[in-house]
Amino acid sequence: MVMTSPTRKPSGDVRPDEPLHHLDQPFREFLDGLPADRPPWFCFFSSGLLHVLHHFLRFTPERLNCVFICSGLSKEEAELRDRMSGGRPVFDMTEQVGSHEIFELLVRNLDRPFGIVDVDCFVTETDWFERCMDGLEPGVAVSGPLSYGPIPLAAPPFLALDPRVRPDIERAIGGTVTPAAYSYTAPGPEKEIDGAMVRLIEPHHERALARVVALEGPRLPFPQGGLVDVLDDGREVRSHERYHHLQNGNEVIRVVFDGLMFYQLMALAAGLRIAHFHSFPGTKVFAPQLVHAGGISYWHRLRPSEIAAGINELPWAAHVDALLLEEFNRRADVPASYRTRGTRLAANLRRSMVDMAGLRDELRAKLDSSGVDVTDPRWAVVLG
């Protein structure tokens, strides 16, 4: 069945199995203070990413109702963030949490459409924020320009969603669903999806999945963007690489659906649609309209096996991270921890026979060949 209008969410949607419930009341009070004439766009980041925020703010339209949610920032970081952002609304939390918990907090507490944009997603076409939100027509659960495949799901670095449709989704599938990561079996010590909380797929989910996902075997969905295969040697790899690893003698012992992916599959099973006003494949994008290298917040923490699994993508995250940090550290008010990291990064680069000038030349060439205007002052200040 196709929904034509969402059922209004009850005030204070109570879901005791979701995390961060102690923040619901202060968060709703915070939401009440946001401008009501424009949909909010939430940008979540944690400690250690002010150099990325510094660049993100260059691409943030003045009129955009941009709202920051921050996890675990030091007092010095929070003060510098506020100086840089010019007083944009911020909701601070002391807890160290991941994006999946934030997705749940947002969908549980908002009763109007909102957007999500990663702090390392630099949107050049400022009208794309409006176009993304305009895609939320009746019968649409999520809208965005980046697409997982082969099932065309919107990718989390830049999307808009309508939380009011969740009751309709749950009624159609016969049970609850959240925008968290999901798996058929409990996670092992690997802590898939960067240590995020992983929820278990229940019978009503399996019945709904059967309507929209092809299976290669029992509890083994066909490879799909946003789906992670956990191998028998503990490695976590993209499902698109499955056949390569099977030919090498590995077995898939568990699959994990990344955050918001499973939620969108349940929306499709309920008869709702995913809207795309543009169609970038995947989440790593270098294009005139936006740049999202992806993985900036965690590439340096990856194990060698994880680096090997994404070797064609992660180096660009390293380029962007290093160059943004170098430029940020020119400020006089940078916290000492950022200068320390800059010193360590420079030493690591020397050991790898790489220098900043080389990274700068490579990133400039990558951006230029992708149609990005490298003379744009926002990029020129980083590229030199």
UniProtKB/Swiss-Prot annotation:
Entry keyword annotation includes Glycosyltransferase: yes
Reaction equation(s) it catalyzes: dTDP-L-dihydrostreptose + streptidine 6-phosphate = O-(1->4)-alpha-L-dihydrostreptosyl-streptidine 6-phosphate + dTDP + H(+)
Pathway(s) served: Antibiotic biosynthesis; streptomycin biosynthesis
Transmembrane segments annotated in the record for this chain: none
EC numbers for this chain: 2.4.2.27
Top-level taxon of the source organism: Bacteria
Function field: Is probably a dihydrostreptosyl glycosyltransferase, involved in the first glycosylation step condensing streptidine-6-phosphate and dihydrostreptose.
Protein name per Swiss-Prot or TrEMBL: dTDP-dihydrostreptose--streptidine-6-phosphate dihydrostreptosyltransferase
Name of the coding gene: strH
